[in-house]
């Protein structure tokens, strides 16, 4: 988006390096906080966006406002968090974006609004021509809508994996320390030793169970996975 420069590494957008003005036309962004002037009305905002985006679709914007039941006689400062998030989505979805980038879009929302927003994401990507990049700490939401999980901890990339591989393939093996330490490293991503027992983060629990039928291995959810990867024991 041109808001900051990387310290290292590289990034490609739509298959090429960098992000041109044309690329930014194809990206819809939803920040954690509403980035618009708080004294605006939603009708004013539509006129402003029309002057910013070449592909602005006013009719689509108005349809989203109606769908989200957003009030047209309130200033933005009087909107609830859920209403502000819906408005940000309405803007992001009304200029024919191919990619949505969202920062904590469901944080602080009630379950009904969260479910509604997740359904919007699923509908957006349903044609296979659109993508959504979500930054979120709500792992249950990621389990519902994500295809891939990228976990970054303290600026370090800890994991980038297909979500289904994690849910249906990864697991936690539990046993005494000697048993866990004896497991072949090809099966293990991380080991953790506690006071009374030890655990291993297993990459392929089906293959692991064939190799070690005597060791119990359970499925793992995203919360458990992230806690395991962050463990320093």
Predicted regions: what they are:
Residues 1:
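Helix-to-loop junction immediately C-terminal to a conserved catalytic motif
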Residues 9-23:
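Conserved ABC transporter NBD signature motif
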Residues 25, 31-87:
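ABC-family P-loop ATPase nucleotide-binding domains
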Residues 100-104:
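Catalytic Walker B motif of ABC-type/P-loop ATPase nucleotide-binding domains
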Residues 106-107, 139:
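Short loop immediately C-terminal to the Walker-B catalytic DE motif
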Residues 118-202:
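ABC transporter nucleotide-binding domain
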Residues 188-233:
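C-terminal coupling/interaction segments
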């Amino acid at each position: 988006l041109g808001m900051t420069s990387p310290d290292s590494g590289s990034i490609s957008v739509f298959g090429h390096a960098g992000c041109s003005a044309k690329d930014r036309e194809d990206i819809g962004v939803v920040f954690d906080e509403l980035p618009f002037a708080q004294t605006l009305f939603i009708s004013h905002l539509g006129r402003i966006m029309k002057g910013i985006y070449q592909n602005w679709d006013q009719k689509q914007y108005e349809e989203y406002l109606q769908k989200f039941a957003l009030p047209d006689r309130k200033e933005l400062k009087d909107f609830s968090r859920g209403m502000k998030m819906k408005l940000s989505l309405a803007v992001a979805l009304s200029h024919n974006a191919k990619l949505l980038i969202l920062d904590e879009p469901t944080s602080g929302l009630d379950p009904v609004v969260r479910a509604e927003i997740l359904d919007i994401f699923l509908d957006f990507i349903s044609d296979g021509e659109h993508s959504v990049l979500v930054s979120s700490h709500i792992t249950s939401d990621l389990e519902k809508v994500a295809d891939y999980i990228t976990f970054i901890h303290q600026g370090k990339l800890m994991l980038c994996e297909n979500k289904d591989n994690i849910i249906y393939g990864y697991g936690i093996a539990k046993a005494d320390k000697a048993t866990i330490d004896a497991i072949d490293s090809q099966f293990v991503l991380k080991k953790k030793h506690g006071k009374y027992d030890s655990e291993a983060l297993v990459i392929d629990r089906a293959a692991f169970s064939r190799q070690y039928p005597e060791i119990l291995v359970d499925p793992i959810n995203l919360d458990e996975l992230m806690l395991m990867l962050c463990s320093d024991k």
